[in-house]
Amino acid sequence: PYEEIQTHEKILKDVLKKVDKNAELTIAGSYRRKVSDSGDIDVLLKSDDKTVYTRFVKMLSKEEYLIDDLAFGRKKYNGVSKLEGGVGRRIDIMYTTPQEYPFAILYFTGSKDFNLMMRQVANDKGYTLNEYNIEKYSSDKKNRVKNIIDPEGEKIKVEKDIFEFLEMEYREPCDRL
């Protein structure tokens, strides 16, 4: 439930502050879309320091917030978290750099249908869009341009910039059905 995820969010942010005061996290997925019933917890961890991700997951385990590990990869953790007295919840923690973050938050907020629509708009304009970047489509990988520059010459820095680049009206997460 939404209220329970709010409690998870507070715990996660408190632990992250102990690990690195400069790192940030956002709970994405259905929680960010304000859906009343969230089955799992999708956490995006943003930092310039790649070691923050590993230290964060280890600290969550040490504090017995994470009760079961399903997978612990280079950039993504899958496991089970549990509040004191609560039930186990599936949790995914994804590490992202600040440069990848706008694309990651767009993708992991969803919904699946909304992501498919955004990718189709990008394709129709000659681009490929994924959770890492947007590229000018080219069958020759050497000629792909990563993290597209917008018309004013600024890199895409926030989620809204992706909508603007694709000439789309920004949609709040709760409107991404």
List where the protein language model places each region.
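Acidic, metal-coordinating catalytic segment for phosphate/diphosphate chemistry
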Residues: 49-177
